[in-house]
């Protein structure tokens, strides 16, 4: 079986990391998988970049320009909206032609347009689409933050000036997506059971096949190690307790840094605690923390990232909206108990008081309570052991690959039946 995974990048962002890991998992389990991307950042032989052309950058710029105009020349929400009004036609590429299954992932920001996707659907090849966020089930957004209009049809979009209208941009894109899907079948795979439920509630995806499979992780790379040795390699003091926060961009409001800042204020009595901030713009938030803090910046070296997980005592991700965060999975694979809000797929990863703490949504008080509980519990080793056990049982490469192979076989059988 030949599978072509399609994603905007092979390295940048959580979806890219997850798609890359899935490709490796499939190749390790008898599938011939390749990955097609616009932005190739690795030297992997199984990752293929789109043919270089000025159009690639133009697709991205044109989409952003149109959004900028529709936002009345405001940069606010500029990267929270996707129109899919520009993108590449991949159906003539040899990698596409030789594939038995086309597996879409995060294909936004000028990678594929709605027209490109429609052409893929009309090619006759079975299509699987992994949902890394709610975008395939809504008109414009990647994060709904409580909005339920996608259950009946998008309009009055909160991201548009004045809150949109009855017949706004979201309504227009919604109808275009309806036309794209008309008479076509896609096998949708959400990365969490929570997102599966959201997708099934979408009026856009009624009649489509939707299931959930978690992202895989390579436990040969992400594994438990000697904490003191990891701290030595990082040049960290050995006698501190480390609270780790990680995000590609730590100032992203959706990642909840404001709640961690407030939680640290409530934990000011933990004089032996230090916050490690992993991600871009880390130095901007360090002065706002009541506890000692060390900005680690953006780290691309996977070995160093593993050292950081192994060096920490607790991982905190107070996101306001999440699917199934790779960072929690990575931390748990390294035996690191996690604390996060009860939102999205986070409660599926963290089993409350078994391998971490699930705090009440948007409660800095409960977030602080969870951090304190992990740092002071007499059962810390048991928490750590359960983290490793949970990842091994639920997120191993083999278990995830087997489930995806089953979906591919269903998609191929359904397509042949329809023909």
Task: Report the location of each language-model feature.
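Short hydrophobic beta-strand element within catalytic cores of glycosyltransferases
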Residues: 337-340, 350
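A short, active-site helix/loop in glycosyltransferases that binds the activated sugar's phosphate group
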Residues: 138-143, 164-212, 217-227
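Conserved acidic donor-binding segment of nucleotide-sugar-dependent glycosyltransferases
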Residues: 352-353, 357-364, 373-378
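Conserved donor-binding/catalytic core segment of Leloir-type glycosyltransferases
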Residues: 237-255, 261-264
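A short, well-ordered alpha-helix in the C-terminal region of glycosyltransferases
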Residues: 379-394, 403-406
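Short alpha-helical segment that forms part of, or immediately flanks, the ligand-binding pocket
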Residues: 306, 325, 329-333, 347-348, ...
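Aromatic "clamp/platform" in nucleotide-sugar-dependent glycosyltransferases that forms part
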Residues: 320
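Nucleotide-activated donor-binding/catalytic signature segment of Leloir-type glycosyltransferases, i.e.
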Residues: 279-306, 314
């Amino acid at each position: 079986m030949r599978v072509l995974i399609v994603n905007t990048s092979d390295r940048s962002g959580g979806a890219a990391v997850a798609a890359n890991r899935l490709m490796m998992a499939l190749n390790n389990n008898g599938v011939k998988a390749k990955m097609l991307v616009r932005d190739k950042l690795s030297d992997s032989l199984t990752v293929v970049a789109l043919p270089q052309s000025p159009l690639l950058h133009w697709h991205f710029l044109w989409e952003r320009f149109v959004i900028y105009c529709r936002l009345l020349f405001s940069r606010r929400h500029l990267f929270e909206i996707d129109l899919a009004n520009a993108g590449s036609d991949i159906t003539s590429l040899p990698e596409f032609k030789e594939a038995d299954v086309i597996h879409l992932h995060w294909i936004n920001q000028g990678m594929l347009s709605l027209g490109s996707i429609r052409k893929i659907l009309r090619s006759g090849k079975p299509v699987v689409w992994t949902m890394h966020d709610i975008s395939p089930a809504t008109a414009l957004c990647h994060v709904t933050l409580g909005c339920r209009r996608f259950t009946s049809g998008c309009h009055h979009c909160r991201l548009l000036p004045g809150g949109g209208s009855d017949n706004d941009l979201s309504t227009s894109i919604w109808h275009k997506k309806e036309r794209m899907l008309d008479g076509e079948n896609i096998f949708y795979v959400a990365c969490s059971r929570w997102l599966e439920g959201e997708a099934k509630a979408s009026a856009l995806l009624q009649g489509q096949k939707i299931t959930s499979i978690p992202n895989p992780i390579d436990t040969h790379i992400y594994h438990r190690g000697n904490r003191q040795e990891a701290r030595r390699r990082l040049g960290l003091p050995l006698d501190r307790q480390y609270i780790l926060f990680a995000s590609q961009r730590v100032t992203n409001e959706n990642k909840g840094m404001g709640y961690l800042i407030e939680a640290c204020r409530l934990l000011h009595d933990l004089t032996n605690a230090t916050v490690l901030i992993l991600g871009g713009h880390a130095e901007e938030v360090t002065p706002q923390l009541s506890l000692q803090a060390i900005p680690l910046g953006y780290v691309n070296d996977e070995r160093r990232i593993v050292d950081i997980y192994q060096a920490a005592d607790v991982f905190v991700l107070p996101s306001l909206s999440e699917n199934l965060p790779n960072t929690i999975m990575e931390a748990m694979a390294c035996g690191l108990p996690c604390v996060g809000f009860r939102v999205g797929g986070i409660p599926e990863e963290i089993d409350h008081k078994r391998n971490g703490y699930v705090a009440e949504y948007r409660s800095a008080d409960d977030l602080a309570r969870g951090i304190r509980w992990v740092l002071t519990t007499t059962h810390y080793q048991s928490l750590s052991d359960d983290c490793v056990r949970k990842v091994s049982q639920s997120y191993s490469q083999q278990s995830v690959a087997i489930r995806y192979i089953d979906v591919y076989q269903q998609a191929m059988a359904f397509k042949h039946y329809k023909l």
